[in-house]
UniProtKB/Swiss-Prot annotation:
InterPro entries: Helicase_SF3_DNA-vir, P-loop_NTPase, PPV_DNA_helicase_E1_C, PPV_DNA_helicase_E1_N, PPV_E1_DBD, PPV_E1_DBD_sf, Rep_E1_papillomaV, Znf_lg_T-Ag_D1_dom_sf. Belongs to the papillomaviridae E1 protein family. A motif (Nuclear localization signal) lies at residues 85-87. This is Replication protein E1. Can form hexamers. Interacts with E2 protein; this interaction increases E1 DNA binding specificity. Interacts with host DNA polymerase subunit POLA2. Interacts with host single stranded DNA-binding protein RPA1. Interacts with host TOP1; this interaction stimulates the enzymatic activity of TOP1. Keywords: ATP-binding, DNA replication, DNA-binding, Early protein, Helicase, Host nucleus, Hydrolase, Isomerase, Nucleotide-binding, Phosphoprotein.
Amino acid sequence: MDCEGTEDEGAGCNGWFFVEAIVEKKTGDNVSDDEDENADDTGSDLINFIDSETSICSQAEQETARALFQAQELQANKEAVHQLKRKFLVSPRSSPLGDITNQNNTHSHSQANESQVKRRLLDSYPDSGYGNTQVETVEATLQVDGQHGGSQNSVCSSGGGSVMDVETTESCANVELNSICEVLKSSNAKATLMAKFKELYGISYNELVRVFKSDKTCCIDWVCALFGVSPMVAENLKTLIKPFCMYYHIQCLSCDWGTIVLMLIRFSCAKNRTTIAKCLSTLVNIPQSQMFIEPPKLRSTPVALYFYRTGISNISNTYGETPEWITRQTQLQHSFEDSTFELSQMVQWAFDHEVLDDSEIAFHYAQLADIDSNAAAFLKSNCQAKYVKDCGTMARHYKRAQRKSLSMSAWIRYRCDRAKDGGNWREIAKFLRYQGVNFMSFIQMFKQFLKGTPKHNCIVIYGPPNTGKSLFAMSLMKFMQGSIISYVNSGSHFWLQPLEDAKIALLDDATYGCWTYIDQYLRNFLDGNPCSIDRKHRSLIQLVCPPLLITSNINPQEDANLMYLHTRVTVLKFLNTFPFDNNGNAVYTLNDENWKNFFSTTWSRLDLEEEEDKENGDPMPPFKCVPGENTRLL
C-alpha cells in the first residue's frame, strides 16, 4: 500500500512518519477535492502560515488522524481478504454453500470498499516473471454436504481478471453440479465396471459366477476380473500366478481404461476372497476396488462351455489340467450318465461306508457330485428328501440282517478286521490286575458271557466312583459296536427296543431303583430265556437278551432285598481309583487296537470258533445290492 506524503512505506500505525508537504502545481495535474480550481491565488493565505506556538500540536494531531485512517484501512482490508478466503477456500466451520444469509450480511458490510478489494485481490497474486496473465485460474476445494451428514470434496476452477466477481455465482453453481456428479460416479463404480466388462467381453460377469456374501468363505476355484492392469504386467501375469495355482485360464483385452484381465484360477488349496485380493493386489499393483473375485457356477453348462471354447482358442492362456466340472459338462458320455439316478448305487455306498443316519447320508453323498455321476444326478433331482429316507431305511435293513446272520465269533472277527493294528493286550490285563481282578478268572467269566450262557450272560462291574467302570465298559462297547440302554427312559414301553439288533449291550450306572425294576420285570432277561419286548409303531417281538454289561455303585449280591438276582449276575469289583499321570493322561490305554489284540491273543481261551478255510469262501462275503451287468463274450 502506497502511503502518499511519506518517505518510506511506513511502519504501521504505531510508527513515526516523516511528513513532507510539497505543493507544486503543473499543467495537467489533478486538483484535489479540497481546492477550488477557479479561486485566485493572491498569496494571502501564506500569511502566518507557520505558527511556532501550535506547530507541535498540529503535527501531532495530523499524525494521529493519519494513523487512525491507516488502521481503519488495514482493518477493512483484512475483513475483505477474510471474506474472499471464506468464499474461495475451505472453511472448517461451515460450508460455503450452506449459509447464504452470512454472505449477504458480509456483502452489505464491505460495499464501501468493493472497488479497493477487487483491485487488491487482483494485485495479490505473485508475478511469474513474465507479467500478469490475462486469465488466472484459482483452484479452491469446496466441501459439499452429503445426504447422510457426510462430505464430498471437489475442485472448483474460477477465472481471474476484472470479470472474476461477475462469474463467481456461475462458477460455484458449476462446482456444486460437478460435486454431485462425483458422488454419483463413486456410488456407481461397480455398475460402471460391470458395464465395461460386458462391453469388452460380450458377456456379463454375473453370468459366470455365483455370489459369496462373506469374504471369509473358502473355495478352490475363483473367477477374477482385474481392471486397469498395465499391459506389461498383464503379459507377465501368467508367469507370476503359476506358483500359486494348479490351473489357470487367462484372457487379456485392452480398452481406453487399460487392460482388463479375466482369470479362472484353481488354487493349490482353498482360499477366501480376502487372501486372493491381497495376493493379486501385490502381483498386478492395482487396488482391491478394481477387482471382482467370485467363485464360478460349477453346475452351469453355459459357463463350462464358455471357458472350454475360449480355452481352446488363441485369445487365452491356460496352464494345468482342466477342472473336472468343465470336463464333466462338456464331454458327451458324462452328459448321458448324469441324466439318470439309481437308488441302488446310493444304498450300496451307504452300506459300504456304514453311513446309516439320514442327515449324514444326504451330506456326504452330495459331496461326491464332482466325482460320481450318480451323486450329481441325485443333486439335480427334485426328490432328494425321498431318496435320502429310502436309502437310509434300506441300508439299516441290510445292516440289521447282516448282523443277525453272524455268530458272536464271526462278529468279533468282523470288528477286528475294521480295527487298526499295533495294539497291546497287556494294557487290559494290567488294568484288571490293578483293580484286583484275576486275569484267568476274568477270561473264564468273559467266555461264558460272550456265549450267552443262562444266568451267566450278565456281568456287573461294581465299585466306588472314579474307578474306571464306565471307561472299561464303554471301550468294549465301542469296539463291539454294542447298544446302550438307559434307565432314564424306563417310563416308556420302548426303552428296551435297542436290544433287538444288539450283539452286546450296556446299562450304565444302575441305581437302586433300576435294580428294583430289574428284580421285578427283567429276571427272565438275565436267565437267558426268550422274552417279549414292545417296539414303537410295530408289533411285539420275541428275542433272547444279548450279553448285558451293567455298571453300578451298588453290589446286588450284598443286598438281601435283591436275593433273586444273586444267582443271575456275575460281579467284578473295581475298588481302586483310576490312575492318571502328571500330564492328565490315562495310565492304562483302553482303545480298539488293544481290544483287537486282546481277542486275537485270547481267541482259543475264549473258545471262539476258529476261522474257516479261505478256500471255502469268506464266512461274511461282501454285500452287493447293485444289479450286475451281463458280459457279452466275443
